[in-house]
Amino acid sequence: LKQWFLKITDYAEELLEGTDTLDGWPEQVKTMQRNWIGKSEGMEFLFRVESHKEPLSIFTTRPDTIMGVTFLAISPNTKLAGKLTTKNKELENFVSKIDNAKLKEADLAQQEKIGIDTGLKAIHPFSGEKIPIWIANFVLSGYGSGALMGVPAHDQRDYEFALSLIHI
């Protein structure tokens, strides 16, 4: 059963189409299924990371905000965060302090936004500007690639984070 939950996003399109063919099912149940499947439409950007071979993939439902990126934030559960914590005790201590693996989006609005600067810089795909990469507790590891582009002018969580930690 765990595989079903892990792979649901791989089959989102087929599952959503299938809900339309469920004859005799209450509309309320079909709507609940559509919401649970939770397909997001957007765009993926690749940010080169200084001194790393692999780029950082960022999925966003707001590609129109790409030019306003102030920081990138990654979940403590990403592969990149794992690599960084093996080399840096301060990052390791921070990641062990926060565990957002079971966090839901509804919980994010209530909790304090905390993070730690990894010291890494990503290269903006259009402007070439260097952008700091943070490990943050408000990034969902199960959404997209577990990384986000911080655009404080267009997102309240990004704004709160940048105001308290980056001092914009």
Model regions and ranges:
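Conserved, charged catalytic cores of large soluble enzymes
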Residues: 1-111
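Catalytic-site beta-strand/loop segments enriched in glycine and acidic/polar residues
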Residues: 120-159
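Conserved small/polar residues in nucleotide/adenosyl-binding loops
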Residues: 166-168
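A generic structural signal for well-ordered coil/turn residues at beta-strand boundaries
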Residues: 2, 39-41, 67-68, 116-118, ...
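Conserved oxyanion/phosphate-binding beta-strand-loop segments in alpha/beta enzyme cores
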Residues: 97-134
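Short glycine- and Lys/Arg-enriched binding-loop motifs that mark or flank ligand-binding interfaces
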Residues: 58, 64, 111, 115, ...
